Amino acid sequence: MEVLMAERADLVFHNKAIDGTAMKRLISRLIDHFGMAYTSHILDQVKTLGFQQATATSISLGIDDLLTIPSKGWLVQDAEQQSLTLEKNHHYGNVHAVEKLRQSIEIWYATSEYLRQEMNPNFRMTDPSNPVHIMSFSGARGNASQVHQLVGMRGLMSDPQGQMIDLPIQSNLREGLSLTEYIISCYGARKGVVDTAVRTSDAGYLTRRLVEVVQHIVVRRTDCGTIRRISVSPQNGMTEKIFIQTLIGRVLADDIYIGPRCIATRNQDIGIGLINRFITFRAQPIYIRTPFTCRSTSWICRLCYGRSPTHGDLVELGEAVGIIAGQSIGEPGTQLTLRTFHTGGVFTGGTAEHVRAPSNGKIKFNEDLVHPTRTRHGHPAFLCYIDLYVTIESQSIIHNVNIPPKSLILVQNDQYVESEQVIAEIRTGASTFHFKERVRKHIYSDSQGEMHWSTDVYHAPEYTYGNVHLLPKTSHLWILSGGPCRSSIVPFSIQKDQDQINVNSLFVEQRYISDLSVTNDRVRHKIFSSDPSGQKGGRIFDYDSGPDRIVSNSQFLYPAIPHENSDLLAKRRRNRFLIPFQYDQEQEKELMCPYGISTEIPINGILRRNSILAYFDDPRYRRSSSGITKYATIEVDSIVKKEDLIEYRGSKEFRPKYQTKVDRFFFIPEEVHILPGSSSIMVRNNSIIGVDTRITLNIRSRVGGLVRVERKKKRIELKIFSGDIHFPGETDKISRHSGILIPPGVVKKNSKKSKKKWKNWIYIQRITPTKKKYFVSVRPVVTYEIADGINLPTLFPQDLLQERDNMQLQVVNYIISGNGKPSRGIPQTSIQLVRTCLVLNWDQDLKGSLEEIHASFVEVRTNDLIRDFIRIDLVKSPISYTGKRNDTWGSGLNPDSISDCTNINPFYSKARLPSFTQPKGTVRTLRNKEYQSLIILSSSDCYQIGPFKDSKYNKTTNCHNITKELIKEDSPVPISNSLGPLGAVPKFLNFDSFSHLITHNQILLKKYLLLDNLKHTSQVMKYFLLDENGKIHNTDPCRNIFFNPSHLNWYSLHHDFFYETPITISLGQFICENVYIFEYGPHIKSGQVLIVQFDSLVIRSAKPHLATPGATVHGHYGEILYEGDTLVTFIYEKSRSGDITQGLPKVEQVLEVRSIDSISLNLEKRVEGWNERVTRILGIPWGFLIGAELTIAQSCISLVNKIQKVYRSQGVQIHNRHIEIVVRQITSKVLVSEDGMSNVFSPGELIGLLRAERTGRALEEAIRYRAILVGITRASLNTQSFISEASFQETARVLAKAALRGRIDWLKGLKENVVLGGMIPVGTGFKGLVHHSRQHNNIPLEIKKRNLFEFEGEMGDILFHHRQSFGSCIQKTFHETSEQSFGFGRFNDS
């Protein structure tokens, strides 16, 4: 007893709290000191003591112990404030949806993390003995993130696909979740309702496949004698921890020297002591043996495997290392399918490091070294390419900050920054463990209206005529509000753009008749000339004539040219020609002539080559019902069962009309009803109804057939397909394409019915109501043949077609709707399917670089006989005419001004032509008896309007003309309540309201003309008009849009606001919300300026969507979009989180070698590149062998790295060698590429690499093959044992094939023996199988080699001689390529 007491007196007494780490240290010291048995005894006593104390203190988790962090309230409030600002910015069009998502996720992630860091100090200060605090921070129970969910906030969750849900859960579990939050948290939580069962089965299946692939791999030899090796070096970005993990338990493949000293020899296994020496001496590089280097793929040797994981010694012979490997990869999957909390989806929150300002002061840097960009949150920033030195000058001291390259600078030069303000963000390199993946995000329109791009848009080359467009630069997409008018009464071609229509009358009168008797006083035409005798600036001729009369030409209304100048036209001039028109007096009275030629002359009168001059709607191609048009070059494809199903390849599409060279097209009728979303439908989707069935309360069906109901956001599309329904049997292979046309006379084989012949074409459409079941709808088709020449002389005057010298007119048929596009009919009207057009062309060679012509309507009166002409001028190049011609007609000012007189509206400006370098403008005056005012139109569409006080001179930047203006105050012109005649502009007191041609950007098609390489430009014009009721109207030949006043905003500004604001607003300009235009405050709504009046603007409201470069725009310019249509698709890179929810599918994806993400795609490309290069260097036989081997080595290493990355990010340690054994099986096959020796392998056969090598040597000729990655499922079905294949999957098929081929199973693996009940060749069963080959192992290596393969000696020498000679360069290129494309280390991580 005394001795014990004396010993105790010597011991040191520690008095401190012991937590997990201290406990670990204590135990390891006890083991070192006392050994295992005694330590366990001591620990038992500690445990008992702990239990006694815990019982006495009665520590338990009570709900009152969960104390919410006090700062949570304002933190959450702050985050909400930030996301509100973000939402506003998104609404104004400053950030797009992806940036908004990213930023909101980072805001909430930061809030959540901050709360988490607050937690511990908060507990420590307020309640240090709190049981929650004691338990979680001592490591006894619970960790920080779990407690954080109890007392902080749960934060962001990811959905089952691993995408973040950007609605954070703000409450914690102590406060309780709202219903929404509960449902969201079920997605993300560990024990999620949605989660566990599915994931567990996934992981189990993964394990099963893994074991299946590698079950036959057993340690059969001590040394296979391989010369291959893999280098590991601690340099390139490997952490020391990973370096140690990679090396420990491996076997060296080469001696390692430090200077002259050899510190380790070949075939020595590496322990921790040796590794420490490597690290201290920085030995470079270390060559090791791995399962990759082992010479056989069906077994493995002890030295290539290394130490056994169980008892740090070399692995025993007969150990089933394959099964161990498969299970050690699969098993963590079962544990890890459960989710981690916050790390889902998108955020790269932790990865960006910030540089903060050291003190207050002014920041300065060299602006030439940076250029502006957007951050990934859509904030403006500067990107620096090289190191940037930033100085911050405070009052007393100057701080220097060095910012590394590729960083973002978030402040401007000379800006005042406060201390600790973030001034730059450093992009982290590839050292982070994040997979990048490319994600598509679709943005849907939330309102209906017309699409508008604010930039030129590239057409992707393969979609030149389609509707997929790539954005070259950041810009806005605008959706201009306005809905299509679905009126059943008005035929579409009566109203032309700019017409004023009394909307109410449309629904009342059955016929729409315009009163032509009202003379049109308001239309004034200006004629410009540049008079050589006049001043340099060019005079303006005011031209006042009697009332113009309106000429009705077939269906369109145009103001006629005043007759005073008819004599000019009678003479034909060079480069100009006249088209006389058939002209009836009767037609003037009857506006709605049934069919007739309609001319299409744009209001600005400029026609380009190949533009349409006139068109004729042939009554034969009219349909009264909706339907789908199909046409293309018809190709007959023989599909399974050799039925001639015709499949339609997409034809090139022109927009808005589709020119066709086909001689026939098909129209598939269907009945379409577009109903409001609230309407109650009385039929079910996919049900079959008869004729005259009631669909909704007041609509009955006109045809019987299959009903398809499609719900969009605010409307329901209900289609009825006539025809019959056919349920295919097992044998009928119906093509999975969306629709096929079957020609008449084809016999449809069906087991149940007798043979059946179709008389007409039919359209077959496959409809899949559920995943398993599908049926086929067979619909009748109307076939239209297109006649080649429609009898022209009857349509167009004869002499016109004979003038060949200066113009060519071609007759072209256009199909109006696109291939496969639905044409929507409007009840009680007809749809025109084909339009015959007269296309204007002229000989490019004769006229030189003629780009465009000017066309106008002319009326010539001779002896009281009136005829109408279209006058067409050829304009040489837009600039060459300025001031040269001297006739009262000519294009006096440049064509950018008005060179023709066909504009209906007096105020108008043409689009900018790309060839103008100098913006010029024109001034036009209007003289009337009552008042006078001035408008300046310039090529940039800017204008200033208004009375100028005290006869001031008004100078404008764009115009060289100085004009003086006097305004007489007169009595206001009364506004009539009825509609004014066509083209009239409503007058108000003292100012003009004018509507104006709004020009859109020109879209450049990258199609060259045939004759010379002029870019072919097509201009898109839109016109809008306002009438007295505030309605705005825009029509196309095919659709009407009416705007209600609710879509517009009116502003009443000060009378003389032009003096107060320097900003001029141009017509057609887009204004974003919240922009300060005038001084009285920000602009309320975003939109496009339609009408500028003296003290008010009319703005058509529009919604901007921001799109960044590379985004894909769906839909055409000016197309009508409904709510819920796809607008843009963004492709953005997202960090794959290490979350195992994505991790497990990820591992599986790598093991099944599915090339889903971009990495494995370029892996395959690189593989091919390698094969070619190596073959070029080495000649064919060695090229294939070495090429395949290098390829395989490269892909092995990258696969191992990818799999390890997922597990390491979860903190799961799996030894590389397990993964390597599996990966070795994936890469052990090659594909025979061409039959060098037809009697050995057939091309396309999968054979083992070693077998290919050996056969090549034995035959003394090259077998051509290439490396291939085989997924684990495929590898399990491509083994040497058909019994193991059959027990895995597809039993009947595998056994039948094996029987037919007469395969022999040598029963080498475990599974075959288990199935047949033999002894398993591992462990003790291994010895008997092996002992007869013992003496073989004692033969010296050289003799054995020579006996086994005669050519082996020379072969080996040549091969490895080569390998050494360009081994160095291979390794170098390896390192480079693998680093570039994977962001992995070199060969190291393996």
From Swiss-Prot:
Family: Belongs to the RNA polymerase beta' chain family. RpoC2 subfamily.
Entry coiled-coil feature ranges: none
Protein name, UniProt field: DNA-directed RNA polymerase subunit beta''
Enzyme class: transferase
Compartmental location: Plastid, Chloroplast
Known function: DNA-dependent RNA polymerase catalyzes the transcription of DNA into RNA using the four ribonucleoside triphosphates as substrates.
Organism: Ceratophyllum demersum (Rigid hornwort)
One GO process term, biological-process aspect: DNA-templated transcription
Catalytically driven reaction(s): RNA(n) + a ribonucleoside 5'-triphosphate = RNA(n+1) + diphosphate
